[in-house]
Amino acid sequence: METTKPSFQDVLEFVRLYRRKNKLQREIQDVEKKIRDNQKRVLLLDNLSDYIKPGMSVEAIQGIIASMKSDYEDRVDDYIIKNAELSKERRDISKKLKVMGEAKVEG
């Protein structure tokens, strides 16, 4: 069996991928936090909507609350999609790193 030393470029690529993987993990955690925060806002607006009655205030308040709720729900959906994209990229990088590591062990 022939042993091949990893080239400097291979090492740089491995380090770059490893750093990207770690960055993606941090971004995923950040996005998950944003999802939780926005879900809490949706719940808050639901509760607030229960307390505001048409006779208590202007009807426009109900419309504003509904609009805000919709905006927060849209944000939650956007963050869920972004999180899925980041997770996919992280998994792809993990697979690449594994292959690169196995190639070096076999080489």
From Swiss-Prot:
Could you tell me the keywords of this UniProt record?
Coiled coil, Cytoplasm
* Coiled-coil zones: 14-41
Subcellular location per the Swiss-Prot or TrEMBL entry: Cytoplasm
Gene Ontology cellular-component terms listed: cytosol
Known Pfam families for this protein? DUF496 (PF04363)
Give the primary localization class. cytoplasm
Keyword Glycoprotein assigned to the entry: answer is: no
Q: What family does the Swiss-Prot or TrEMBL record give for this protein?
A: Belongs to the pole-localizer TmaR family.
Q: Which NCBIfam families match?
A: PRK05423.1 (NF003844), PTS_reg_TmaR (NF040881)
Main function: Pole-localizer protein involved in the regulation of several cellular processes.
What name does this protein carry? Pole-localizer protein TmaR
